[in-house]
């Protein structure tokens, strides 16, 4: 009986969430906290425990799902498993308990301009073959264990490859049972699936650093644009391979520094947006929504986002003005978030409740709104304010009219027929590192089923491809 009850709860929550994301009017405002280290505080764990042991991060989420009436949340919003990053020897993380105190969130340590992971003169190498560049140049620079090209291979080099790849497989495989546990034990929806980042954000985050990229935009913008174009097919491919097979929950894009004043409006319009918009459109053509997790203030770019197909995105409010976002985007796209993290950390619960009520009664008055904090909730938010946001949503978020039916999810094209040429005909092709056409020249004539040999080669090649790209995107 309990199993049936949880399944009914899950079905109702999923309908509520999907209805809102497709701009419908559900029975009430769905609640979807992107709760990271705050879950550790609720569960009695330290930041070190939920960052270095993903099983404890999973358990912290389950305890929150049990104790709060959330419609959806992320299976592990801490996400970066520092056991894996240590196995790969990654230099750019401050690990709780090792590099920073045990109850401090992990830190990303961007290198100085002089020690950037990609040098300015290496743009052509990245453009010519992104995957080869990642393995031969980028990986040895970001890791203390992997050897540079031309160096003698070491024991630590070989061990790092084996440990980190097996750790990645273990970690990603564990998400399936975690999502099922959320559904079975708590009736809670896993809020997102997959991952996307803008090409220009990747250049700044993992290759050139912000300072280096800023100078490149001013001095060699053509090379920056070519690099972004070279990354596009791979980022689109990665997003599609991780998307929800049912096309119910969105693919998130973590938008870091693509807004003014980090870059100029000119560079947004000439580089950032032209190399991101086609990816979002390609995902939508396959029936996948994208969650624009717009970190920072994006008011200057809302009109550009409004040119996307209706319902194709969910726009998340960090520091974007909620009223302006609703005016420009609210007729086409669902909005989410808007509860300032500083208020969740320092305000009294009554003030948090008032903020939630205002959001519901203004931008959420006609549906198409999902309650959440402005940014990922780390360990600075208080449990009292987390409860206040939850309770206020249930109290003020009930709509007067009956729930509208869940809108039909756009049908996905068969196979990859709907993918544009810039993905399917990219050279090198997304999804492989060493193409079969190259490998077959090293082999004797194939006997028996040649297509079987090619298929198995491509499938296993895909694992090597996913490994390096997830080091870039996920870790």
Regions found by a protein language model. Give the residues of each.
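Catalytic cores of TIM-barrel enzymes
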Residues: 1-475
């Amino acid at each position: 009986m309990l199993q049936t009850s949880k399944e009914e709860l899950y079905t109702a929550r999923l309908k509520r969430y999907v209805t809102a994301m497709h701009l419908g009017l559900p029975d009430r405002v769905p609640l979807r906290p992107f709760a990271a280290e705050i879950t550790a505080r609720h569960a009695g764990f330290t930041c070190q425990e939920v960052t270095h042991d993903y099983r404890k991060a999973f358990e912290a989420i389950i305890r929150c799902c049990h104790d709060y009436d959330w419609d959806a949340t992320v299976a592990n919003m801490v996400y970066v498993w520092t056991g894996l990053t240590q196995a790969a020897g990654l230099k750019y993380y401050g690990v709780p308990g090792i590099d920073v105190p045990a109850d401090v969130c992990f830190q990303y340590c961007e290198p100085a301009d002089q020690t950037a992971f990609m040098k300015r003169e290496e743009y052509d190498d990245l453009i010519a073959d992104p995957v080869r560049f990642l393995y031969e140049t980028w990986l040895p620079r970001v890791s203390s264990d992997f050897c540079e090209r031309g160096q003698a291979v070491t024991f630590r080099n070989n061990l790092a490859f084996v440990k980190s790849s097996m750790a990645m497989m273990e970690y990603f495989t564990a998400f399936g049972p975690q999502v099922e546990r959320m559904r079975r034990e708590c009736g809670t929806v896993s809020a997102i699936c997959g991952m996307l980042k803008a090409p220009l954000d990747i250049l700044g985050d993992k290759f050139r650093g912000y300072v280096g990229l800023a100078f490149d935009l001013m001095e060699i913008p053509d090379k920056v644009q070519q690099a972004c174009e070279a990354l596009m097919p791979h980022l689109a491919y990665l997003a599609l391979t991780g998307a929800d097979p049912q096309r119910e929950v969105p693919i998130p894009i973590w938008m870091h520094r693509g807004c003014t004043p980090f870059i100029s409006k000119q560079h947004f319009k000439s580089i950032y947006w032209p190399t991101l918009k086609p990816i979002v459109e390609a995902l939508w053509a396959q029936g996948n929504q994208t969650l624009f997790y717009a970190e920072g203030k994006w008011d200057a770019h809302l009109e550009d986002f409004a040119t996307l197909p209706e319902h194709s995105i969910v726009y998340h409010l960090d520091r974007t003005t909620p009223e302006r976002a609703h005016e420009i985007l609210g007729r086409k796209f669902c909005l989410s978030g808007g509860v300032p993290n500083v208020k969740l950390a320092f305000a009294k619960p009554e003030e948090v409740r008032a903020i939630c009520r205002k959001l519901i009664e203004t931008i959420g008055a006609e549906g198409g709104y999902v309650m959440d904090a402005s940014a990922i909730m780390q360990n600075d938010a208080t449990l009292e304010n987390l409860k206040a946001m939850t309770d206020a949503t249930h109290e003020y978020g009930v709509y007067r009219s009956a729930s509208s039916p869940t809108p039909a999810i756009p049908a996905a094209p068969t196979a990859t027929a709907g993918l544009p040429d810039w993905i399917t005909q990219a050279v090198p092709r997304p999804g492989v590192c060493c193409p079969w056409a190259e490998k077959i020249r090293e082999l004797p004539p194939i006997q028996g089923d040649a297509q079987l040999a090619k298929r198995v080669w491509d499938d296993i090649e895909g694992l090597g491809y996913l490994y390096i790209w997830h080091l870039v995107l996920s870790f």
